[in-house]
Design a protein with these regions (language model features):
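Extreme N-terminal tail/first-helix region
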Residues: 1-19, 123
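Intrinsically disordered, low-complexity segments enriched in polar/charged residues with Gly/Pro
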Residues: 6-10, 21-24, 50-51, 96-98
């Protein structure tokens, strides 16, 4: 991937503090807004331990994330409690003790136009 495209994606991921997570699986199609924080190209979300999203992720790790500024497709991984030594501000959110950390490894990001509708640019983050 070109350095400028990677940097553009990293900058876009840093902006939102919340993102809508969309999953599908045995619990059906699920969409919910959760707190998030990025480290480099990895995006971390706090998802309640009782969420149907986690059940879906156990069966299918493909996810889509949405914010006002971008749409992202990627692979999610549930990080078991106590396993991570990440220093995330996200872990200090109110109610974080009732949540599980989910890491999303992005495959593709579509940055939206600031005015109007549609996408301004698409960045492929993985080459398959």
């Amino acid at each position: 991937m070109l350095d400028y495209a990677r940097q553009r994606a990293i900058e876009a991921l840093k902006i939102p503090r919340r993102a809508v997570l969309a999953t599908s699986g045995p619990a059906g199609i699920q969409a919910g807004e959760f707190p998030c924080e990025a480290i480099d190209l990895d995006l971390y979300l706090l998802v309640p331990k009782t969420s149907d999203h986690l059940f879906n992720l156990e069966h299918d790790s493909n996810v889509t994330l949405l914010t006002a500024g971008w749409q992202l497709k990627g692979q999610a991984q549930i990080i078991p409690p106590g396993v991570s030594d990440l220093r995330l501000d996200l872990l200090r959110e109110q109610g974080a003790e009732w949540c599980v950390l989910v890491r999303v490894d992005p495959c593709q990001m579509q940055i939206r136009r600031e005015e109007g509708w549609g996408n301004l640019e698409t960045i492929d983050l993985k080459s398959y």
